[in-house]
Structures are given as C-alpha cells and as structure tokens.
Amino acid sequence: MLLPWLNEELIEAGCDEAGRGCLAGAVYAAAVILPKDFENELLNDSKQLSEKQRYALREVIERDAVAWAVGIVSPEEIDKINILNASFLAMHRAVDRLKTRPQHLLIDGNRFKKYPDIPHTTVIKGDGKYLSIAAASILAKTYRDDYMNRLHQEFPCYDWEHNKGYPTKKHRAAIAGHGTTPYHRMTFNLLGDGQLELFSK
C-alpha cells in the first residue's frame, strides 16, 4: 500500500508530469489533494497499470479528491524554456488551478522550481510511494493520452495513438519520411543519432 501523506497535519497536493521524454506534443502535469482517509488498493504508479485500470482510477480520483487540476505546457513553450523548466511550469499551472490551496507539495522526482509561498518535498519515484503523487501521475498520463489520440486523428502517419509521441522506431521513421508537424519539439533530437546517419545516405 502507498503512503497516504507525508505530514498528516497539512493539506498536501501530490504533483507529477507526463510526456517529458516525448518528441511531440505538450507536457502535462496534474496536482491532486486526496482526503486523509482515502484508500484504494489499485492506486499505483500509472506506468504499472493497464490503460483500462488508469481510466477507471481517473473516475475514482476525480470523484473522491478534495481537489484536482491539470496543467499544460505547449511544444512551442517547451522549445523556448527547455523540457525541465516546462515540466516545472506544467506542475505550477496545475497547482494554480486547484480549488483548495495546499499547504505542502509532494513532487515526483528529485528537482523542482519552488512554487510561491508553498513549501515542497521532492520524492524520487514518488508515484510508487505516495497516493497523491500516484493519483497525479494517473491524471497527467490519461489526459495527455487523450490529447495525443486527438492529434493522431490529424496526423495518423506518426502512430501517436500508440506511441503517444515517444521516440519509437516507427515515429522516427515517420519523421524521416514525412517531416515534422507543428506539434513536434524542434529542440529535441527528433531522428536520433543512429537514424540521422541512416536517412542522410
């Protein structure tokens, strides 16, 4: 079972992002405040769950959470400020949108840009340790998946329905064959070192 809180006396929000390692699409983040007595044995790091489980848990989280919100940073913004800062900004935007103001933030990972007037604790692999971070990981992942599925309808050749923008062979081959889209992150190594050689011959 995951831990329900770090400090029982504080209103804590768990924060996580999705899409940091992708070649295309926005980065999404979520912030979730759960009730202190929240329990769910299935709730875990989104990467450990099936797609069906993630969407079922999203309904539970949205129904039972004290507050939840999603923040988004576009590919254009990612290219301007870099993906690390974009991940922090997405989390800040999610916290901005919470209807209940948290007193403490639990952040998945080992780095974070301080949010104004709210202390935080970074937790490596926090989505496998704290319920609120796991809940945030599920919301960020599922809402970003929905977004990439919509983009797939516009640009089906990149297989975003399956790879969600991550650097698969099929995705990189499509970039080499069809070029980029407005949704690709132009500051990323889109073809990969090995494939750059392959397609330049």
From Swiss-Prot:
Enzyme class, first EC level, given as a word: hydrolase
Highest rank taxon of the organism: Bacteria
PROSITE patterns named in the record: RNASE_H_2 (PS51975)
Family: Belongs to the RNase HII family.
Entry EC number(s): 3.1.26.4
Keywords noted in UniProt: Cytoplasm, Endonuclease, Hydrolase, Manganese, Metal-binding, Nuclease
Keyword S-adenosyl-L-methionine: no
Binding-site positions, a divalent metal cation: D16, E17, D108
Compartments (UniProt record): Cytoplasm
Ranges for domain RNase H type-2: 10-200
Free-text remark on how the cofactor is bound: Manganese or magnesium. Binds 1 divalent metal ion per monomer in the absence of substrate. May bind a second metal ion after substrate binding.
Record Gene3D superfamilies: Ribonuclease H-like superfamily/Ribonuclease H
Protein name per its UniProtKB record: Ribonuclease HII
Gene name per UniProt: rnhB
Reaction catalysis annotation: Endonucleolytic cleavage to 5'-phosphomonoester
Keyword Nucleus in record: no
Obligatory cofactor(s): Mn(2+); Mg(2+)
InterPro entries named among the record's database cross-references: RNase_HII, RNase_HII/HIII, RNase_HII/HIII_dom, RNaseH-like_sf, RNaseH_sf
Stated role: Endonuclease that specifically degrades the RNA of RNA-DNA hybrids.
Record's GO cellular component terms: cytoplasm; ribonuclease H2 complex
GO biological process, any: DNA replication, removal of RNA primer
A molecular function (GO) term: RNA binding
Transmembrane segment boundaries: none
